[in-house]
Amino acid sequence: MPRRKALTNNNNAGEAEQQPPKAKRARIAFHLELPKRRTVLGNVLVCGNGDVGQLGLGEDILERKRLSPVAGIPDAVDISAGGMHNLVLTKSGDIYSFGCNDEGALGRDTSEDGSESKPDLIDLPGKALCISAGDSHSACLLEDGRVFAWGSFRDSHGNMGLTIDGNKRTPIDLMEGTVCCSIASGADHLVILTTAGKVFTVGCAEQGQLGRLSERSISGEGRRGKRDLLRPTQLIITRAKPFEAIWATNYCTFMRESQTQVIWATGLNNFKQLAHETKGKEFALTPIKTELKDIRHIAGGQHHTVILTTDLKCSVVGRPEYGRLGLGDVKDVVEKPTIVKKLTEKIVSVGCGEVCSYAVTIDGKLYSWGSGVNNQLGVGDGDDELEPIVVVSKNTQGKHMLLASGGGQHAIFLVKADKQDQKENVPVKVSGSSSISKKDKTPPQDNVDKEAENVDKQEQKENLPAKASTSSKKNKTPPQDNADKEAENVDKQEQKENLPAKASTSSKKIKTPPQDDAAEEVEEESAQEPTPKKAKKPAAKRGGKKT
């Protein structure tokens, strides 16, 4: 007999068919807010070599052994040192520049004699929130999220141009149609973070610092030439979360994921300056996941990296020569982040020159260490300092240091201004047009303003994360080594040192920082660096780019 067909419950089947499909989870869009402009007013100080006007003290001042004030910049709130130029951001969002303008890094007309060596305003289509300077380029983030840049990038063959069209002597919109929230400059590359958590890179890629090109393409000799180098392009990491913070050293790029807090790094690693192994290779062409944790800020020079963690401690990694790591008489490469033990106080800000380093304490004390050949350390002599030393000067005595930034042969500092200083700093010019945003948004990381209120509402803004808010008042110790007495003793010496140098004899006194030729060093890392020599020509640094 034929089998009977199984009976089906038509009612149940109908109910199943009528059930609505499961609702899809709404994807929450990742979004970073624009940062706030710094608010603590400061005075600009400089030291080092000024052979191309990077000291901002006029054509006749070619050297400063100690920190000297720069006039004509009112209400300064942020600074950035390039290779041979500087940017200063004011409270109102204007930008002053001074120094070498051979390739347009100043972003303004300097056809008038002596105009490079004195601070002057850059004409921008809006007000700036933050600034960054490289060897020959400059950039800023405006209040509406646009990124403007000017100048040029360079590689081992020389000038690359800022875009495929060449150098740009005035600011141009580099990321049209994209809202950005952070920028960071290396020597010859620029890193940009968008509000969507995406990272874009542009510039020289010879050391892998762009993190997105093949070994054949990094030199610009591929099928597409330099087009892929000079057009901001997204750096994509498979399975990585959106990013919330970026940093750049001379030849490296660092990024932090928003959810995992993982730090990714790409670029030159011949002295382990990425703080991670690259399996025998000199550089990382694409980002590698590091073991760095709890990072507040990262700075670096040619072959070393300075790391500031959220517990306000300073660590270093990389090449030790000339004392740039601050660890004493160390001979071997430091492959893992090592705490600088001489910095016993809480550190709130770090900076680097090519072969030197700086740290600012919660009490506003400035430390410097490394190569002193160009007087970048600001301690009054040209000696190298193997360990951190307190910088003592009549221009910093009794004042609170805020920021430090090192260039190729000079350094720039921001010291908190008092009421009298603010009256004396009268604006030279009125800024151009602006597009001021009505709402200043809080940055996604290092919420400086809120943290500062927990430390000291009057003096410690922008200098401390929330976890350390209860300890600041107890840590205000007087400068070491009787700083007040030292400052009095150096006053007379500074008066002698601060006499204008004669142009006819200045070339004999100009010193050049130790040039770290990475290509040769990789082959012979154990070999000692030659003793730094004095420069014969001011433009010596404009040669081919060294790796």
Curated annotation (Swiss-Prot):
Record-linked Gene3D superfamilies: Regulator of chromosome condensation 1/beta-lactamase-inhibitor protein II
PTM sites of type Phosphothreonine: T286, T512, T531
Superkingdom as given in the UniProt entry: Eukaryota
Region (Disordered): 1-24, 423-547
Listed GO CC annotations: condensed chromosome; cytoplasm; nucleus
Disulfide bonds: none
Compositional bias segments (type: Basic and acidic residues): 437-464, 482-499
Residue ranges of Bj1 repeats: 417-454, 455-489, 490-519
UniProt record, GO biological process: cell division; central nervous system development; NLS-bearing protein import into nucleus; regulation of mitotic cell cycle; regulation of mitotic spindle assembly; regulation of neurogenesis; regulation of nucleocytoplasmic transport; ventral cord development
Organism field: Drosophila melanogaster (Fruit fly)
UniProt biased composition (Low complexity): 427-436
RCC1 repeats: from-to residues: 41-91, 92-143, 145-195, 197-257, 260-310, 311-362, 363-416
Listed GO MF terms: chromatin binding; guanyl-nucleotide exchange factor activity
Function: Promotes the exchange of Ran-bound GDP by GTP. Involved in the regulation of onset of chromosome condensation in the S phase. Binds to chromatin.
InterPro entries, A to Z: Ran_GTPase-activating, RCC1/BLIP-II, Reg_chr_condens
Keywords in alphabetical order: Cell cycle, Cell division, Cytoplasm, Guanine-nucleotide releasing factor, Mitosis, Nucleus, Phosphoprotein, Repeat
Compartments where located: Nucleus; Cytoplasm
Name recorded for this polypeptide: Regulator of chromosome condensation
In-chain residues carrying the UniProt-annotated modification Phosphoserine: S526
Biased composition (Acidic residues): 517-527
